[in-house]
Amino acid sequence: MSWRLSETKKAEAKRPAWRLSDAKYRVSKLVATLGRRRLGRVKLGRLKPFVGLITVFALACVFSPARRGEIIFLDFGNLTDILRQVSEKGIIAVGMTFVILAGGIDLSVGSTLAFAATLSSVMLMRGGYGTPETVVTVLAAGLLVGAINAAVITKGRIQSFIVTLAMMSAARGMARLVSGGSGVEIGYGDGGAPQSFASVGAKVGALAPVPALIFLATVAMAWVVLNKTRFGRYVHAVGSNETASRLSGVSVDWVKFGAFSICSLLAALAGIIHCAQLEQGNPNDGVAYELDAIAAVVIGGTPLSGGVGTVIGTLAGTLIIGIINNILGLNNVDANVQLLLKGVIIVGAVLLQRK
């Protein structure tokens, strides 16, 4: 008996000071193992987005119109167009993944894109700035938008839905202020934007578009952050149980600050790509982009309640939406019907997650 007591005392002596509180220690262990338990619970669920992607791809091949006996959908040019078209919304969806995983929502990403695209065009055409200065300034502006969102949410204790809804209006208002209320065309060549800015929306030779490569690089970096860093583990933990995370010593406010800042930063990056591809920035751009981003995240297996999900699933969700939009366009389906189908798909994805 004395031997057991001495061993217990030795174990307590070795235990760090912050573990001396048994309640706090148990909570800390809970947060530390959230990721491992989550893997065991949702390993099968993670496959659903990819099963859906394969299914949608197969259906697209079946329902695609043909030209000269060849399936138009499988044409290399069409597939690269899909990648190019989903890049902007996909980048936004990656940022939205951080926010939703942390238990929040960001409705201002579409307006942030419009603000970033408009600011880019104004700096290039009216300010005479070069590509590096423009890109850095616009990304900093996007980061500031996210910081404001996070500060009001965490310090004011206001729901993210309300705060970002207000920022949705404010960011679009800022876009109108910097542009004078109208779109600004940039163009390239004499008197236009630098050719280096055009490369942001161009292709690498005859292969993949640069926006698609940026999108895939963003997914890769987000995967590393969410799966290989302490911040990523904290994002999952806060979304799973904010109270337990706070009790264990996690700085919940800073985690949310990081998530919302990353989201707005990526929305600004998407705005730069948007401006480079369309050769203009317009305060009215990006309408309903937040819905597409949320749809991609949810279809990718991340519930709106947060805590569980992967950025790879978001990639799959983005491609699913892109393929559906493409095949509907190839079949000349009315745009209003496309919106209706998108809503049905989102509801279906949520129902599948609950089973």
What is the predicted function of each stretch?
Residues 25-93, 128-133:
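Membrane-interfacial amphipathic/re-entrant helices at transmembrane-helix boundaries
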Residues 129-138, 144-149, 153, 205-281:
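Helix-loop-helix "hairpin" substructures at the membrane interface of multi-pass membrane proteins
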Residues 57-62, 75-127, 152-158, 297, ...:
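Single transmembrane alpha-helix segments in multi-pass membrane proteins
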Residues 49-62, 96, 169-173, 214-223, ...:
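Hydrophobic core segments of alpha-helical transmembrane domains in multi-pass membrane transport
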Residues 1-51, 352-355:
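Transmembrane alpha-helical segments of polytopic membrane transport and secretion proteins
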Residues 160-229, 257-258, 278-283:
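Transmembrane helix-bundle core of multi-pass membrane transporters
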Residues 38-44, 102-105, 124-126, 144-188, ...:
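Short loop segments and helix-boundary regions at transmembrane helix junctions
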Residues 261, 267, 277-343:
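Transmembrane alpha-helical segments in multi-pass inner-membrane proteins
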